């Protein structure tokens, strides 16, 4: 049953423009960071440093762009039937709405990871073209790990926003606005050692290894993200009760 729901939801996404929006936003992040890399520091361009592009793109994308895109994608999937007035027709079919919502969240999680891996692929290709010989296997694998864990962690961090917007039924574009404010606030949270440990968006960086964090900070980050997941599930549970 869950497999069929995942397949059906993936087919709906393939027919929508939301994936193109997500892909375009990811490519634009790469282009913007590449342009920033042309600036010089002591007569040396940032882009000339091996690994700089992969590192800079990851942080800029997380603070400014990708959480909002992922939140938009997730809330779009959940709100789509409501917005397009097809929910009543869907209820004529014996579909478990709780499982359907869970399938949408799982698919949004998968796309969150894929979006970050797409950004990694873009940055790695640029790094390989510019200075292949300077790249070590360890550096590439470390960045791959960071991007992958960011994709996982960012989805967990913003899952309450996706669930809340779905509960509010005010339009999935609100998720983009809320997530943008939420992720941008991470810049200010990162200035404080205490806030950096407990704020969900920066806790992701502690877990992924982007920040130099000790084991205690990593464990706190895991707990914070688990709280976000539990909160989103509670909100979605209320959503399904409301729609019955």
Residue ranges, per PLM feature:
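Membrane-helix interface segments
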Residues: 17-19, 96-98, 102, 139, ...
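Secretory targeting signals
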Residues: 28-66, 70, 102-168, 208-212
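Helix-loop-helix units of permease transmembrane domains in multi-pass membrane transporters
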Residues: 77-109
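Hydrophobic/aromatic residues in alpha-helical transmembrane segments
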Residues: 70-74, 122, 160-161, 200, ...
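Generic transmembrane alpha-helix motif of multi-pass integral membrane proteins
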Residues: 9, 13, 91, 159-170, ...
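Hydrophobic alpha-helical transmembrane segments of multi-pass membrane transport/permease proteins
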Residues: 17-40, 58-73, 114, 175-186, ...
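Terminal transmembrane helical anchor/hairpin motif
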Residues: 35-54, 172, 176-244
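Aromatic- and glycine-rich beta-strand/loop motifs that create alpha-glucan
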Residues: 1-26, 170
